């Protein structure tokens, strides 16, 4: 049986109609399905547990990276098959699999393909599929939340990026890779990346792979103010790792300590 996890009011209530289309498509396959509606933060995880308890072995998530992250955290090591239907602003996880932007086309592509196993990261007990980030991307997400009351999601994000670029300050952190000695870093961004992109296509970890058993740890050190305007195009093209703005280390375990640290787990902010 398929369980369909959906926030019925997301996308101007389009998600609810999409969930019905998906259940109709599942019925055409001769399979049963049940819709599980979410209501707020953390509810996607609860509804996923309910779906598993109801006997669902295939889980469809309609949502953005944050909702997908919540659902995936409950599916690790369960043996359930996970279908992602992109319905957020950035949809970076769906982008990593080159899924079509059209939600139904993305679902059809997964039905036609074979399941693959991927890695799942854990940060202070919280799961993530794509990235755990600190620094610039956290500041952008915080500003985006402020602007959402005025602008729709994608426009709010673009305006937030431009706003933060002009005033962002680097932060201090102590970083240890795979149990090694701590190094003190003055950072613009630290990304512990399982996937390649954030923010709807900024390629912060252009060589990361979802199934290689490693994180790509991307450290962008303090950038001189005159070079800050280069950050955005460098991230979009993945050039920051090639022109000396960043260093990349592959690792299985990362420890980072910073005063008042907030991390971005697949689009959701967590104070650690």
Provide a role label for each language-model segment.
Residues 8, 62-64, 85-87, 194:
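Glycine-rich beta-strand-to-loop/alpha-helix junction loops that act as flexible
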Residues 133, 137, 191-205, 269:
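Glycine-rich phosphate/pyrophosphate-binding beta-alpha loops
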Residues 3, 29, 77-188:
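Catalytic core of DAGKc-family lipid kinases
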Residues 6-8, 63, 221, 258:
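Short beta-strand/turn micro-motifs composed of small residues
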Residues 148-156, 200, 206-227:
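Gly/Ser/Thr-rich active-site loops/lids in small-molecule metabolic enzymes
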Residues 1-59, 69, 105:
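ATP/NTP phosphate-donor binding region
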Residues 67-80:
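Short Gly/Thr/Asp-enriched flexible loops that form oxyanion-binding sites at enzyme active sites
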Residues 15, 177-179, 184, 209, ...:
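ATP/nucleoside-binding phosphotransfer catalytic cores, i.e., glycine-rich phosphate-binding loops
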């Amino acid at each position: 049986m398929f369980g369909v996890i959906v926030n019925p009011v997301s996308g101007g209530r389009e998600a609810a109609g999409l969930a019905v289309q998906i259940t109709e498509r599942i019925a055409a396959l001769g399979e049963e399905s049940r819709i599980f509606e979410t209501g707020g933060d953390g509810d996607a995880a609860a509804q996923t547990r309910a779906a598993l308890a109801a006997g669902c072995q295939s889980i469809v998530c309609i949502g953005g990276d944050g909702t997908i992250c919540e659902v995936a955290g409950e599916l690790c090591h369960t043996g359930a098959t996970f279908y992602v239907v992109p319905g957020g602003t950035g949809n970076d996880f769906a982008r990593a699999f080159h899924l079509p932007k059209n939600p139904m086309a993305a679902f059809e592509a997964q039905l036609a393909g074979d399941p693959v196993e991927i890695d799942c990261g854990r940060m202070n007990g919280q799961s993530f599929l794509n990235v755990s980030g600190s620094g610039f991307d956290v500041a952008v997400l915080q500003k985006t939340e402020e602007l959402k009351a005025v602008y729709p999601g994608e426009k709010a994000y673009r305006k937030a990026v431009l706003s933060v670029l002009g005033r962002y300050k680097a932060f201090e952190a102590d970083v240890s890779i795979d149990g090694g000695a701590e190094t003190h870093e003055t950072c613009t961004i630290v990304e512990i990346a399982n996937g390649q992109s954030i923010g709807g296509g900024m390629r912060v970890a252009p060589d990361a792979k979802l199934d290689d058993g490693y994180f790509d740890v991307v450290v962008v050190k303090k950038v001189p103010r005159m070079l800050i305007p280069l950050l955005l195009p460098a991230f979009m093209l993945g050039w920051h790792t090639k022109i000396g703005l960043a260093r990349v280390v592959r690792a299985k375990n990362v420890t980072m300590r910073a005063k008042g640290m907030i991390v971005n787990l697949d689009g959701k902010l967590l104070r650690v």
